[in-house]
């Protein structure tokens, strides 16, 4: 967008992580793209995603033709954003960045409907969570954060997630050996 993002932000305020995630988006835009603007924020409850996201996005795009980015903060919202883009003739011109690494959304990247997705390995998160709980149970110091990395998927690397995309594919697997060795199960 060359620093000229005009954004429709789709949120679900009922979901607890939404508030810090939106604050992070706003802070990042303020620090790194002061000329970018959130034109409209659409709050849709999880149980209404299937009926409310598509018409709300269509309306936002028609009311604000300058919009060039739609951010569904949870990537499963994308399945309702893509039809709105198709119907408004903006599919492929309006960028759709999102978060979670859900396989069908990664396939949307391959199809050109979503521009990028910040993914996380659920398996890696599980290993890190178990490690933290084991440390707590043994009276050991536990890390303050899981320290599980994110992976940014776009058209240049989405094939690493598989065709079709699979959960936990594309993130590497060195963590499995690392945790098993740490726990004394291997080696």
Model-predicted regions and their roles:
Residues 6-11, 26-48:
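Short beta-strand elements in bilobed, periplasmic/extracellular small-molecule ligand-binding domains
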Residues 9-12, 111-123:
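Short beta-strand elements at the ligand-binding edges of bilobed clamshell
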Residues 10-20, 69-75:
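Extracytoplasmic "Venus flytrap"
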Residues 1-5, 20-24, 52-54, 101-105, ...:
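Hydrophobic alpha-helical segments within soluble ligand-binding/sensing domains
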Residues 2-6, 32-39, 64-69, 90-95, ...:
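Loop/turn elements at helix/coil->beta-strand transitions in domains of secreted/extracellular proteins
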Residues 17-20, 79-81, 107, 161:
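Extracytoplasmic/secreted cell-surface and envelope-processing proteins
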Residues 32, 124, 128-187:
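Hinge/cleft segment of the Venus flytrap/periplasmic-binding protein
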Residues 25, 45-108:
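Hydrophobic alpha-helical
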